[in-house]
C-alpha cells in the first residue's frame, strides 16, 4: 500500500506515551502536538525516535489549559481501581456526582479532565484485556460512564494482534467520538505471521540462558506439571505465533524461549522484541537490554494501531467538522 502525503493532517496528543507506539501508528495520518511520559528511560527512547519532540513528565502536574488544542487524544493509561467510598456516600445523600468524584486519584482522571477542557473530536485509549473484569468489572463500568458523561459516543473492542504479527497479544481499545459516527473497528487481515520471520540470523551469546537459569526453569515447570497445571517456560513455535511479550521478559525470558538444538535455549533480542511489536528496524533502541524488554513488553502493536487510526480518520470525514486525510493507492 502506497501512502501519499497528508494534505491537511489532523492533530493529536500522546499521553502515557511510553516509547511512542500509539504515535507511530497515527503519524502517517497526522501531526503530534504534545507528548507526556513519566519514565526517564522511555523518554530517552521516545526522543531518540521522534527528534525534536519535547516529552513532558508527570501529567498530573500539567494544567489542561497548557495543552494545545487537538483533534484526537491518544493514551495507553495504567489500570487502577477506583475508590467508590465517596461515590456511595454521595448517593446515599441523594447528591449528584460525576467523573471527578468517581475517578479522582487515578491517572484516568487526568484523561477525563483533559477531554473536558480541550474537547477533542475523538480519542483512542488502550489497555490490557483484563481491564474489562478488573475489580469485579467496576473499573470498566466507571470508565465508560465517565467518557459518556463527557459527551462521547464510545466503542470498545478487544483485538488480538496475532493475525498481523507473530505474537498472541490481546488488548482492549476504546474509541470515542463527539458525534454519533458510524464507526467500526477494522477486521485485521490474517497474514499468517510466523515467528521465524522476525528472528535475527546472528545472535550474541549473552542471550543464551545460563545453565543455572535454564535448570531452574526446568525444575519450575516440572513442579507445576506434577500439580497438573501448565505453568512454566514456553518454547516458542517458530512456525506460528508466540505467547504475549510482557514487561517481565527481562527476568528470564520464560514466556518466549527460542530453541537452539543441543545448546540451551535463548531469549529474544531487543530487536526481535521490537519486530514482534511491529516496530520497523529503523526504530532506535538506545537503552539497556533490561529497559528495552520492559519498554517493548509495555508497548502497543504498531500495525494494529495504524489500522485503527485509518478507520477512525476515515470515519471522521463523515462528521460536521471534516478532516482532510491521506488518499490511498491500494
Regions found by a protein language model. Give the residues of each.
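Short beta-strand element of Class I
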Residues: 32-34
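C-terminal target-recognition/interaction regions appended to catalytic cores
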Residues: 209-330
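Class I SAM-dependent methyltransferase "Motif I" SAM/SAH-binding loop
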Residues: 15-19
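S-adenosyl-L-methionine
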Residues: 44-67
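Conserved SAM/SAH-binding beta-strand->alpha-helix loop
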Residues: 39
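Class I S-adenosyl-L-methionine
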Residues: 62-72, 84-250
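Conserved beta-strand elements of the Class I
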Residues: 11-13
